[in-house]
A protein has these predicted regions:
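Functional surface patches built around histidine and acidic residues
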Residues: 2-156
Length: 156
């Protein structure tokens, strides 16, 4: 699922882009990513690879914001379904950051690679990944029942 929200409009979201559950089968590659990078940074590396392929600047990792993304992924895993943060939750999480637009991709799958592939195959997710205004991202990952739950928050 993908979502974008504006820092200039406290009243709501610029876009709520819902594209359904991402329940993915197994894919090639490591289930939790390149252990040298750690799974969060590996997910960002996959996203940055897609951005580079489409002539976009790479995103910097937002470490402090990643704690919020992780807690959201853990909450989804505990509840057993994917859902977005509310606009108010995203605005609060982004408080203290310099941003004009923020977005969120959430999903669950067998591997980070399969999640990134699914995000790129989904127009709303793809738009979040490739949006030129974004220059930072935070990744939160939880594991439950042999599945990986991911929250990626973009801002710029």
């Amino acid at each position: 699922m993908a979502r974008a929200t504006s820092g200039r409009r406290l009243g709501g979201l610029l876009a709520l882009l819902m594209s359904g559950l991402l329940l993915l089968g197994a894919a090639s590659g490591s289930a939790v990513g390149d252990e040298r990078l750690g799974p969060r940074r590996h997910m960002l590396a996959l996203t940055n690879s897609d951005r580079t392929h489409h002539h976009r600047a790479t995103l910097s990792f937002a470490e402090r914001l990643a704690a919020y993304a992780k807690s959201h992924s853990e909450a989804m895993a505990n509840q057993g379904y994917i859902y977005h943060s509310t606009g108010a939750q995203l605005r609060e999480a982004l408080e203290g950051y310099k941003w004009e637009l923020g977005g969120e991709n959430v999903g669950v799958g067998a591997s980070l690679e399969s999640l990134e592939d699914a995000f790129m195959a989904s127009e709303p997710h793809r738009k979040n990944i490739l949006r030129r205004v974004y220059d930072h991202a935070a990744v939160g990952i939880a594991r439950a029942d042999d599945r990986i739950w991911v929250t990626v928050i973009f801002y710029g």
